[in-house]
Amino acid sequence: MKKFYDRKNELTALEQIEKNSLNSANFTVITGRRRIGKTELLKNYIKNKRSCYLFTTRSSEALLCEQWQKSLADDIGLKIFGKITTLSYLFEQIMQYSKQEHFVLVIDEFQDLQTINPSFFSQMQNLWDSNKGDSKINLIVCGSVYSMMKKIFEDEKEPLFGRATGKINLTPFSPSVCKEILGDYNPGYTNEDLLCLYMLSGGVAKYISLLMESGSTTKEKMIEYVTGITSPFLIDGKDVLISEMGKDYGVYFSILALISRGLTAQNEIDSVIQKNTGAYLVNLDKVYSVIKPIRPLYSKSESRNARWQITDSYLRFYFRFIYSNQSLVELGQYDLLKSVILRDYETFTGKTLEQYFTNKINEEKQLTKIGGWWDRKGENEIDIIAVNDLEKTCSVYEIKRQANRINLSKLTEKVNNFKSIVKLEIDGYFIQTFGLSLEDM
């Protein structure tokens, strides 16, 4: 996309970090799933600053040092005589230079340095600790393998634990930004077009860019593009997760496929997989951040009445339609794959619509908590409850694709059931009920 969208909060935070680094060394970590827009954010941020952008290629240490040495000389005037062959010596020279000169240094795909030289992070820790007191460097690192970046900086056994002075986790674009982008490319878009865009991208910058730049700005064109022979949407789910999970992805993928089909309780998943999947579910949640447990609002955190949810809209789509129909892709039956998607589209996008409105409400209102609710028997279920504990307000929503299917009187009955169970939690709160449909997007 030619235009740079949103990221106002992140850019504001980065500008404050820049001011801080004029007086003391700053070490900022940018995380976020692949394709989220980390590199674009940083390139936009440094374009008018004295800066150097270093990309970690999977080459030998000596070759990488040669590439970086040239970039440092060209971009910030750090001229080092002789040929450098070790990352530790190069970083030492960078830290020494930063004692006299202020600059921004961005290292992309930072986690790959561990593969190139397993001892480098320990060496970097020592050099940082020894030189940061006199340095004025604004060091920013980012990486696309989320689980590795998290381990490098958040595992107390790792050498760089506690060294970051700031962390920014990049999240998908909000519903309002998705609307802005689609409106720029297709001013006459329908809400069905917007829902399809959200189903396929979930606000992830790269996926939106692929669709918009290919002219896929309507539901029909998006589905056509996604199921085309050259479509990156057919392979990206596998590519993104294998980089995180490595060779042990088989069971994880089977679990994600089941969750995408609506089997969201562990006992349901266990019965199909034929083994206890508890450890796998914990890893998918805590290590890979691909799923999360959803519990009824006001239930205890240890409540077993939990449902697992894929947190990423594209991955939910990928496992429901692409991974589960991989044979159609391998046989080149793209038209048949398209027919399968269109056949189940309305049912599948019901949950997408709920997620869209959850994010939209959270974006537009001041809330202390938001979520759904259901009783143990599953007989009473409320799509969205948005609470402001400070103002003692509680807004309850029923979500349907079609407005004429919303039944507020039935929703009121569910609210009464909800109130009788949570009791004191919302005693004295002003409660309102609403219905939202495609028309309200």
Model-derived regions: residue spans:
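Phosphate-binding site recognition
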Residues: 1-339
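A cross-kingdom feature that marks ATP-driven nucleic-acid transaction machinery
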Residues: 304-441
